[in-house]
Amino acid sequence: MIILKNENEIDLMRKAGKILGETLNLLKEKVRPGITTTELDRIAEEFITKHGATPSFKGLYGFPASLCISVNNQVIHGFPGSYELKDGDIVSIDCGVCLNGFHSDAARTFGVGNISEEAEKLIRITEESFFKGIEKAYVDNRLTDISNEIQQYVEANGFSVVRDFVGHGIGRKVHEDPEVPNFGRPGRGPKLMAGMVLAIEPMVNMGSYRVKTLDDGWTVVTADGKLSAHYENTVAILPNGPEILTLIK
């Protein structure tokens, strides 16, 4: 069941989203060769709790950390450890923040030091595909209008969208209905309505869209070992169009 949010609830999510956007901006400054993924997790959790909120992911389904940190061919759900980021890596950081009972969810992919032109393009196209998608995030459009726009843009640029994992509704729970795929034919799925809040999150692979899960039960990697990027924001569907709740310029 899709749960519509009223103006007050969206305002609460806006506040959670602001903390999350600021967290990701801080992490962007901290990403550098030599820093461990555990240190990034510590920085994020400290910043979130200092602002009176809690990390949404820690303990969710038994997840052990505040951040999902996925490096290079890792797609999503990597968890922090002793790995030191290296020059040329790309790192996807996915984070959630809960404030006053409402969640926000967002992800960014950053280059570490000097990265290849192809890796830069992958990160850029992944981010741009999100913004292409939300051009369709208007009342009375269909959910897969967003999905199709993302897929068309990604594939036109020579990359592929992950199909085994999708975006989702969000609110009092991190994961709510509906599922928000990044692929599919337009004109399908539920009609978009004012009060929907969606976590829209293109996951884009340099090679095949196929993925697999490692033996740790969490970390999802590309099946062909090629790079993957992830970009996500929490988006409210309002009567006059979409509002991104987790993007702080």
UniProtKB/Swiss-Prot annotation:
EC top class named in words: hydrolase
Co-factor(s): Co(2+); Zn(2+); Mn(2+); Fe(2+)
Residues that hold substrate according to the record: H77, H175
Single biological process term from Gene Ontology: proteolysis
EC id: 3.4.11.18
Cofactor note text: Binds 2 divalent metal cations per subunit. Has a high-affinity and a low affinity metal-binding site. The true nature of the physiological cofactor is under debate. The enzyme is active with cobalt, zinc, manganese or divalent iron ions. Most likely, methionine aminopeptidases function as mononuclear Fe(2+)-metalloproteases under physiological conditions, and the catalytically relevant metal-binding site has been assigned to the histidine-containing high-affinity site.
Keyword field: Aminopeptidase, Hydrolase, Metal-binding, Protease
Gene Ontology molecular function terms on file: initiator methionyl aminopeptidase activity; metal ion binding; metalloaminopeptidase activity
Alphabetical list of SUPFAM superfamilies matching this protein: Creatinase/aminopeptidase (SSF55920)
Pfam families: Peptidase_M24
Reaction equations catalysed: Release of N-terminal amino acids, preferentially methionine, from peptides and arylamides
Positions contributing to a divalent metal cation 1 binding: D94, D105, E232
Binding site for a divalent metal cation 2: D105, H168, E201, E232
One cellular-component annotation, GO: cytosol
Family matches, as HAMAP family: MetAP_1
Subunit structure: Monomer.
Role summary: Removes the N-terminal methionine from nascent proteins. The N-terminal methionine is often cleaved when the second residue in the primary sequence is small and uncharged (Met-Ala-, Cys, Gly, Pro, Ser, Thr, or Val). Requires deformylation of the N(alpha)-formylated initiator methionine before it can be hydrolyzed.
Family to which the UniProt record says this protein belongs: Belongs to the peptidase M24A family. Methionine aminopeptidase type 1 subfamily.
The name this protein goes by in its record: Methionine aminopeptidase
